[in-house]
């Protein structure tokens, strides 16, 4: 029996000389604004994707011009924490070296730039490096940006959890010097074929992307169960003692292919803080060795666990870690939203959470968000914390500085907007015009769509109820739509699949309710359901739970078996 053929990316990684490929040669070429097909896969490991302006694609084709290529670069910012000085550097880059002139906060607690011409890539990466920031492993078949609850109320516990998140990020970084050589002009050392170049990853890295999050109960804004690997903090007397480990979550799927599906992670048990790195490395190396390298659509950890079985996977992880799981500890996970406005921490410092619509920090008529953040950064003595809901926390503000910070935020439109419960719990991906995978709008359309949802809630007398609404332009699920009470997933321009039935806490997936429908149909369906919900809901019952209890959709118990159909 012949050996099964590997996915093309596996050969690219093997032949890349530890992610070098011909990126340097492509960067130096002025013949085209793009990289070669192979290098387009490798540059992801360095933190950026090649894109083009899809709004202009046909026009440029008629003019016999190549697409207007640009790049999206994503930074690695573990836990979403950066200093005001770093932010000023980030802002300067956005203002001078990108065509979008904006900073986009992401659903994974970092920021990204859009509209970067190839000639500016190296300058941007070197600019980030001067601020002790980088983009290595922000994309690609590696451990991505590690998330951690900002949780400003429990500041001591947050600090402990954040340190774990940062150590995880640093420990699981690729060891290759390709990034330093290509972008930072460091000297190339003698290339070796020895696997010790990448002691954890090996020559072919992971089969697919790997996402990790640290949650600090009662908050679940990091959507811990949607990650490949999750650590839910367990505290005793305010001190971190360990984590409940979860594994096997992931949102991506492909329309019409039932062998692909979103999945929430399984609970595996409690581990002590000192064993976190052992277990993280064990889970990753099992995925490295067992993951599917022939079909990238089935390469995520969730499929590895489904295909090999929970008990077999658990036993292998314990064997590699050299430690057994203890029974999971009781913790309560609740709200996935952010605490907007001022919140006082246990240390007496104050934290101001700003709502950033779809995470886009940009100066527009009536709202100078980018200027406002710049002015705050010039005087702020604490830090900035990006949230996984695409918002920003001005953290660690002394009582005597509150009025000044708030004044600047209000002056520039960062504070003071009327914010409904649902809008504050809702997110969207970028989608068109830059994302090559988008089938429909998301970020550009989402504010208008939420206006409609707000109006329907007001009409039906349920404005007091927060509903988690999420929209993506495709089923890859960057804004985690399959864990939303109302999920909209792009199918074609102006058309979406409507998903219902996830719970508010993020521990149950939703299920398709209507397929390939337009705005008018979506709003008509939701209007009718909101009317029922207003009358028939039980006390304290959330919308997602209502749709399951009343049989609007069936609960998803085991996604491999019941997400489809």
Curated annotation (Swiss-Prot):
It comes from the Bacteria. GO terms for molecular function: 4 iron, 4 sulfur cluster binding; heme binding; metal ion binding; NADP binding; sulfite reductase (ferredoxin) activity; sulfite reductase (NADPH) activity. Keywords: 4Fe-4S, Amino-acid biosynthesis, Cysteine biosynthesis, Heme, Iron, Iron-sulfur, Metal-binding, NADP, Oxidoreductase. Binds 1 siroheme per subunit. Binds 1 [4Fe-4S] cluster per subunit. Gene3D superfamilies: Sulfite Reductase Hemoprotein, domain 1. Pathway: Sulfur metabolism; hydrogen sulfide biosynthesis; hydrogen sulfide from sulfite (NADPH route): step 1/1. InterPro entries: CysI (IPR011786), NiRdtase/SiRdtase_haem-b_fer (IPR005117), Nit/Sulf_reduc_fer-like_dom_sf (IPR036136), NO2/SO3_Rdtase_4Fe4S_dom (IPR006067), NO2/SO3_Rdtase_4Fe4S_prot (IPR045169), NO2/SO3_Rdtase_4Fe4S_sf (IPR045854), NO2/SO3_Rdtase_FeS/sirohaem_BS (IPR006066). It catalyses: hydrogen sulfide + 3 NADP(+) + 3 H2O = sulfite + 3 NADPH + 4 H(+). Alpha(8)-beta(8). The alpha component is a flavoprotein, the beta component is a hemoprotein. This is Sulfite reductase [NADPH] hemoprotein beta-component. It comes from Shewanella sp. (strain MR-4).
């Amino acid at each position: 029996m012949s050996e099964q053929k590997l996915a093309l990316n596996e050969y690219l990684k093997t032949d890349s000389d530890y992610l070098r490929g011909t990126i340097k040669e492509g960067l130096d070429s002025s013949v085209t604004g793009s990289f070669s097909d192979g290098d387009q896969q490798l540059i992801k490991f360095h933190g950026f994707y090649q894109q083009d302006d899809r709004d202009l694609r046909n026009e440029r084709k008629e003019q016999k011009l190549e697409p207007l290529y640009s790049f999206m670069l994503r930074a690695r910012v573990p836990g979403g924490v950066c200093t005001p000085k770093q932010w000023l550097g980030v802002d300067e880059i956005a203002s001078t070296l990108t065509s979008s002139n904006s900073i986009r906060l992401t659903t994974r607690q970092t920021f990204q730039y859009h509209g970067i011409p190839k000639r500016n890539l190296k300058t941007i990466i070197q600019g980030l490096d001067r601020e002790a920031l980088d983009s290595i492993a922000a994309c690609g078949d590696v451990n991505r940006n590690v998330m951690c609850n900002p949780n400003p109320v429990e500041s001591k516990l947050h600090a402990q959890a954040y340190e774990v998140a940062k150590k995880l990020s640093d420990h699981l970084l690729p060891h290759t010097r390709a990034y330093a050589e290509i972008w930072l002009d460091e000297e190339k050392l003698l290339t070796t074929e020895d696997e010790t170049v990448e002691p954890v990853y090996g020559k072919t890295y992971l089969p697919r992307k790997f996402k990790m999050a640290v949650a600090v109960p009662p908050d679940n804004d990091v959507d811990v169960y949607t990650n490949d690997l999750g650590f839910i903090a367990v505290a005793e007397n305010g001190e971190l003692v360990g984590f409940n480990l979860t594994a096997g979550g992931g949102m991506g799927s492909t329309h019409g292919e039932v062998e692909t599906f979103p999945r929430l992670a399984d609970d595996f048990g409690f581990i002590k803080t000192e064993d976190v790195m052992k277990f993280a490395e064990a889970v990753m190396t099992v995925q490295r060795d067992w993951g599917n390298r022939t079909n990238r659509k089935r390469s995520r950890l969730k499929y590895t666990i489904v295909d090999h079985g929970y008990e077999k996977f658990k036993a292998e992880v314990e064997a590699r870690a050299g430690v057994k799981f203890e029974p999971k500890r009781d913790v309560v996970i609740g709200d996935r939203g952010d605490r907007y406005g001022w919140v006082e921490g246990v240390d007496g410092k104050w934290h101001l959470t700003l709502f950033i619509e779809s995470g886009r920090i940009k100066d527009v008529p009536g709202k100078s968000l980018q200027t406002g953040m710049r002015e705050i950064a010039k005087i702020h003595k604490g830090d900035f914390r990006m949230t996984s809901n695409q918002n920003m926390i001005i953290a660690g503000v002394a009582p005597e500085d509150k009025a000044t910070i708030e004044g600047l935020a209000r002056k520039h439109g960062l504070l003071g907007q009327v914010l409904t419960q649902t809008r504050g719990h809702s997110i969207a991906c970028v989608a068109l015009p830059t994302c090559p995978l988008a089938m429909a709008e998301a970020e550009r359309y989402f504010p208008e769509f939420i206006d409609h949802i707000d109006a329907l809630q007001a009409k039906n007398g349920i404005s007091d109820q927060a509903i988690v609404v999420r929209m993506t332009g495709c089923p890859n699920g960057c804004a985690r739509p399959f864990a939303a009470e109302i999920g909209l997933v792009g199918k074609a321009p102006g058309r979406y699949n409507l998903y219902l039935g996830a719970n508010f806490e993020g521990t149950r997936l939703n299920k398709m309710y209507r397929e390939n429908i337009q705005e008018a149909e979506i709003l008509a369906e939701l209007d009718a359901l909101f009317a029922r919900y207003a009358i028939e809901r039980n006390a304290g019952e959330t919308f997602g739970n209502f749709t399951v209890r009343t049989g609007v959709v069936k609960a998803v118990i085991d996604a491999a078996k019941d997400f489809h159909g």
